[in-house]
């Protein structure tokens, strides 16, 4: 594990634990998600995954040499994440959401903020 990643894990541990014990997540794990909620989750996820590489590229381009390790981390993950939007599209197809609906879907303000301000 790289030092950068190890430090990232330590620094985000409290937030990760809060997420893992959030009542909505615990309820979904215990009882599952209604199909419509799962479709919405996938539609939101599609937009996050679709924008991951452009957002990462923009972030990497702004990093100076003092943050080379972060830049290389972003490059590596851009490569690893390429094409994952197709995985989400396949899941959307499997639950009856046509491609046209995915393209026309307006993501929530939360998703737009995540994609637009990172």
Where are the regions that the model predicts?
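Serine-centered coil/turn micro-motif
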Residues: 2, 22-23
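Alpha-helical transmembrane segments of integral membrane proteins, especially early/N-terminal helices
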Residues: 1-11
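Residue-level recognition of alpha-helical structural elements
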Residues: 1, 34, 67-70
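Alpha-helical bundle segments that constitute or directly flank the non-heme di-iron/ferroxidase center
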Residues: 9-20, 27-64, 83, 87
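Active-site-proximal alpha-helical scaffolds that flank and shape metal-associated catalytic sites
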Residues: 69-118
């Amino acid at each position: 594990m790289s030092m950068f990643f190890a430090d990232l894990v330590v620094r985000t541990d409290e937030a990760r634990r809060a997420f893992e014990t959030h009542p909505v997540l615990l309820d979904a794990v215990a009882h599952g998600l209604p199909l419509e909620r799962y479709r919405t989750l996938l539609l939101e996820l599609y937009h996050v995954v679709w924008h991951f590489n452009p957002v990462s590229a923009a972030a990497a381009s702004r990093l100076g040499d003092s943050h080379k390790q972060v830049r290389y981390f972003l490059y590596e993950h851009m490569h690893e994440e390429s094409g994952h939007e197709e995985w989400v599209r396949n899941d959307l197809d499997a639950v009856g959401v046509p491609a046209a609906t995915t393209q026309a879907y307006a993501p929530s303000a939360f998703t737009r903020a995540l994609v637009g301000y990172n």
